[in-house]
Every structure is written in structure tokens, then in C-alpha cells.
């Protein structure tokens, strides 16, 4: 039987491989029934190239992105119009030739001057004493010839309760007017709620029936006064005897200081409050209060919201000068009620008091005489009275010291008279009957030495110019149409053409004065001195 071997593929091997194959072939017949031993072989290297990069190159896509386009715009600006101008100095002029100095005879000129000297001096003295041009002034501005009402201010809620305007005051800038609401007639005032209101007259769109600030007060307000330098601070005196200070720049919580109900507090209504500089610190101020309990007290604000008593005075009947013949007071009453105060413009310690008994009293803050009183006080009370003047026929509700003369002051009483006094004599220099009813206020003008104003119980404000007449008013202004009393008035020391007056109808009227009452004459102060001298002699 014949066998045919199938062909195997040809493979190149190395020499070692060939030798092994030859040896294996020789003994193959002998070992054909068992496997041959394993041997190492070294094979050729086969490389397979990567297809990934080429595939990614085919499949990949290139993308790009950016933010949205930024919109920009350009513009230019310049003045709407322009103008060009050229300037230069004027063409110089040739100076005129200096005239030759004339020749004169020195001896003859000297003789002439000696001869006329006495005559020229005599004429100059005559001109100095002449009154030919008194009152002549150049009018640079238009003259206001009438007195007109600029504003009629009223708080409807207070007016609806029948409250009176008991006090008014201008602030230190002259732009804000404050008024106190209370009562000055019969009635139970102890539980009467009242108000303090302010109006800024310089504010645009002024509403005369809507105050800028309203402060509600639990007791009737009898008087008030703005701080001399702090435009928003107001001191007020109440019917209950308390003294309060408000800061009107804090309308939500305006109360700054108060005396509280202590042994130092007044026991009767406070009729006047004033601000006084402290003796050693002129930029600091304290509050002075005067009441019908006979006490004049000085208060200083503390950090605890309290007014602390620093000094006090009491008016005891037995300590008044002997020239004062007061009616015998009721049993147990030894104090003289105070109704008004005015300080001298020339001596900060000198002041005048108006009293319920009708006597104006000259007083001093420097007094060290102990007051004979049993009223309780945390500080020693002094007796301030130095001199007593002849009385009115009733209580003196207002006194005013002249800002131009150290010795003159005015007083107004319920007898309807205004008295002009000198500090140097008891009798008044002159007495003017201005009303058949009470006079509640009198004030000197801050700019005219011979002008003053008075408020009457017949509803009039009367303006006097003593340069024109010393017996009758120059102008009488009707404040109330029904004759209701005018209780208070104040000149504006900053805007001197303004005069404010408050009345029993609950209204405050601001009057614009004519230039005749606001422009001082060239010799007015001298005329005031002469008036005092003529009346005194």
C-alpha cells in the first residue's frame, strides 16, 4: 500500500533550528511513539500599525465659540453756542505835560492864612452844631410807606379748642417763628392740653395753617423763648410751674430737658423764660424762669434730660425797699408774684421785673443777700431787689429795656398805660395811656432808638415814634376785627422789617413795617439822650 505525504509550507529557520531538525530526523524512527522535549525558539517580529489616530482624524470635528458681540456707540458733546472775543488795553495816551509850578509869595500866603483862620474855625463850629440837614438821607432803595400783613398763621386744632397765643419768639436766623398756645382768661388750665408750633417763613410753599413742627404739651404753655445761637432749641414755661426745653429738629422726640416736679420747681404758672450766657462760659447758656410764686430761677441742662437748678432768687415783701407801699398781703403770703422780666443790654447782671402788685423792680444777679422765705430749695435763695419804681394801677405784664440807652426801659400794665422810666429815678419820665383796657406787651425796636410797639386788650398793635410824637401812636394796626386782645408781640432782630403779634383768637400775624420804622436817623441816639435829659430836668 503506497502512502503519499502531504506537503508542508516552507519556513525559513536559523542554523540552530536546522541542526535540531536534522538530529530529530535521524532518531525520529526510534522515538516515534513519544513526544519530543520542549525547546526554545526565536521567532521574527511582526508589527501591526495603529488605526486609531487615522480613524479619529476622519471622525473628529473642529468647533469654536465666543461671547456675544459687544455693542458700542460713540458720541460727542460740547457747548451749544460759543463766542470768541478779543480784548486788549486801550491805546496809551501821552501824559500831559506837567504845568510848571507857579511862583507865589510865601510870606504873603502865611499872612493870609493867619488872617482868615479864626473866621474859618468859627464857621466850621457853627456848621457842626447846625441841624439844617438833620434827617436828610440818600434813598438807595425803594421806600415802603405802609404797614402790611404778610402772613396769618394759625393751627386749626388749637384754634378749635379755643386756645390763645400766649407767647411768640423768632429764632436766631430770623426765619422761624414759634408760638405757644394756652389760656390767659378764666378757666381750669391745670388739665388743658396745649401746643408749641413753629413756621419756617422762608420755606417755599408755606402753608399758614400747617406748622412745620407741632409739639403737644400736657399743660398750658404760658411763654417761650428761642435759644440765642441754637436755631432749633426752645425753652417754655407751663401753667403747672414746669420749665421745658425742646429740640425742634427732632420732631419725633423733641423734649430735651425738663425741671420735673421737684421742690425746686415753681409752684405757680411761669410767666416768662429767657436764655442767659453763663458767667464764665459765654458760649454756654442757662434758662431763667420767673413765676407768680415770687421766684426767679436759673437752670442748666444735664445729660440725664433734667434741668438742674444753679441759682435762685425770691421776692419777699419784707425785703422790698421802704418806698414800696404794697397792700397788706393775705395771711401766709409773703412773696411778690413776678409777671415779666427784661435784662439790660449794657449790664448782663442788671434786670427789671414786673410784678403782680404793679411795681417795676430793679434787680441784680450779683446780689448775695439771703431771701427771707421758707420756700424749699436745693440752693440758697437770694433777694435781688435794689430799687423800686412808682407803680402802675395793676399788674405789669411786660417790661422792655432799651437796646440803645443803658438807663431807659418801658413797662406796660393792666391800667392801659405805658411808662417810660429811667433807672436813676422812681417816677416815670412819661406815661402814655394807649388803651382803656389792659396792655399785655411792649417792646423797643431793635433798630430804631425812638420806636416801640405795644399790644392792647382792644385788638390793636400800636407803633410809636417818639421823634414824631410823644403823646399819640404813629400807626395803629388792627390785629383782630372783633376787638379780641393781643397778648404778645416780638420784633425780628434779623429781618428788621418784620413784627409778629399773637392774639386771643389763636392767630399770629406777621406784619411788614414801612421803612419809616426800620431806618435809623442820623441823630436818633442823641435825640434819645436829649429826650431823657429834657424830661429829667
Curated annotation (Swiss-Prot):
Tissue distribution of the protein: Expressed in brain, thymus, heart, lung, liver, spleen, kidney, testis and intestine.
Residue ranges of the region described as DYNLRB1 binding: 107-132
GO molecular function, one term: dynein light chain binding
Subcellular locations according to the entry: Cytoplasm; Cytoplasm, Cytoskeleton, Cilium basal body; Cytoplasm, Cytoskeleton, Cilium axoneme; Cell projection, Cilium
KW Phosphoprotein (keyword) present: yes
Keywords for this protein: Cell projection, Cytoplasm, Cytoskeleton, Phosphoprotein, Repeat, WD repeat
Classification via SMART domains: WD40 (SM00320)
Assembly, per entry: The cytoplasmic dynein 2 complex consists of two catalytic heavy chains (HCs) and a number of non-catalytic subunits presented by intermediate chains (ICs), light intermediate chains (LICs) and light chains (LCs). Among them, a heavy chain (DYNC2H1), two intermediate chains (DYNC2I2 and DYNC2I1), a light intermediate chain (DYNC2LI1), and a light chain (DYNLT2B) are unique to the cytoplasmic dynein complex 2, but a subset of the light chains are also shared by dynein-1 and dynein-2 complexes.
Protein name: Cytoplasmic dynein 2 intermediate chain 2
